[in-house]
C-alpha cells in the first residue's frame, strides 16, 4: 500500500465519477439502469453556478490513483431532529479490495456525520453482497429490522404525481 488519502470530488473528477458509477452498476448487475450523465452530475454536485449541491463525493486514492469512491447526501431524522448522512454508493475497484479502503471511506463518512452534528450514517446493501455486509457489520452497522426500502419510478411516479388535485 503506497500513499493513501481521501479527498473530495471536484468538477474535473466527474468523468472518473461517471466511470466509477458504470463500474459499480456492472458489479451490481444493473448496467442497463444507468441513466447518469456528466452534465447531470455537475448539477447534483453543485458545480453549476447558483446550484445547491444535493450530492457529495469523496475518492480514496492510492498513489494519486482513484481506488474507491463514496457518494452521499444529507438526510434528516424527525425522531432525533438531527441531520445525518445517507451513503448512496460505496465502490472500491477490484484491484484495491482487501486493503481496508471501504472501511476507511465509512470511517470518513462517520466523522463527517459527527462534524455536521449528525447522529447516524444510513445506507442499503444488496442482500447477495455478503462481503460488503461483513465489512459493514465489522464497522458496527446493524441491519434495521422491520423496515423495507420502497421506491416509485417511471410511469408509476408520474401516475402518483397526477393523483394530486390541481388546486394543490
From Swiss-Prot:
Keyword Nucleus belongs to the record: yes
Location(s) in or outside the cell: Cytoplasm, Cytosol; Nucleus
Major site of localization recorded for this protein: cytoplasm
Gene3D superfamilies assigned to the protein according to its UniProt record, in alphabetical order: 3.40.630.30
SUPFAM superfamilies: Acyl-CoA N-acyltransferases (Nat)
Residue intervals of the N-acetyltransferase domain: 4-167
Site (Important for catalytic activity): 136
Signal peptide: none
Alphabetical UniProt keywords: Acyltransferase, Cytoplasm, Nucleus, Transferase
Nucleus is among the record's keywords: yes
GO cellular component terms, semicolon-separated: cytosol; nucleus
GO molecular function, one term: diamine N-acetyltransferase activity
Superkingdom per UniProt: Eukaryota
Entry EC no(s): 2.3.1.-
GO biological process, one term: cellular detoxification of nitrogen compound
Family classification: Belongs to the acetyltransferase family.
Record's function text: N-acetyltransferase that may act on a wide range of D-amino acids. May also acetylate histones, polyamines like putrescine, spermidine and spermine, and certain other small basic proteins like nuclear HMG proteins.
Official protein name in the record: N-acetyltransferase ats1
Organism in which the protein naturally occurs: Schizosaccharomyces pombe (strain 972 / ATCC 24843)
Amino acid at each position: 500500500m503506497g500513499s493513501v488519502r481521501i479527498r473530495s470530488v471536484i468538477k474535473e473528477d466527474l468523468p472518473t465519477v461517471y466511470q466509477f458509477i458504470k463500474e459499480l452498476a456492472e458489479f451490481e448487475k444493473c448496467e442497463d439502469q444507468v441513466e447518469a450523465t456528466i452534465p447531470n452530475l455537475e448539477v447534483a454536485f453543485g458545480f453549476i453556478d447558483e446550484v445547491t449541491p444535493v450530492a457529495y463525493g469523496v475518492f480514496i486514492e492510492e498513489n494519486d490513483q482513484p481506488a474507491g469512491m463514496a457518494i452521499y447526501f444529507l438526510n434528516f431524522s424527525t425522531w432525533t431532529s438531527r441531520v445525518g448522512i445517507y451513503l448512496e454508493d460505496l465502490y472500491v475497484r477490484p484491484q484495491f479490495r482487501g486493503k481496508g479502503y471501504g472501511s476507511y471511506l465509512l470511517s470518513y463518512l462517520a466523522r463527517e456525520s459527527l462534524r455536521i452534528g449528525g447522529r447516524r450514517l444510513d445506507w442499503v446493501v444488496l442482500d447477495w453482497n455478503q462481503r460488503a455486509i461483513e465489512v459493514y457489520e465489522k464497522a458496527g452497522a446493524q441491519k434495521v429490522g422491520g423496515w423495507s426500502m420502497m421506491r416509485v419510478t417511471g410511469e408509476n411516479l408520474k401516475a402518483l404525481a397526477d393523483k394530486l388535485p390541481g388546486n394543490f
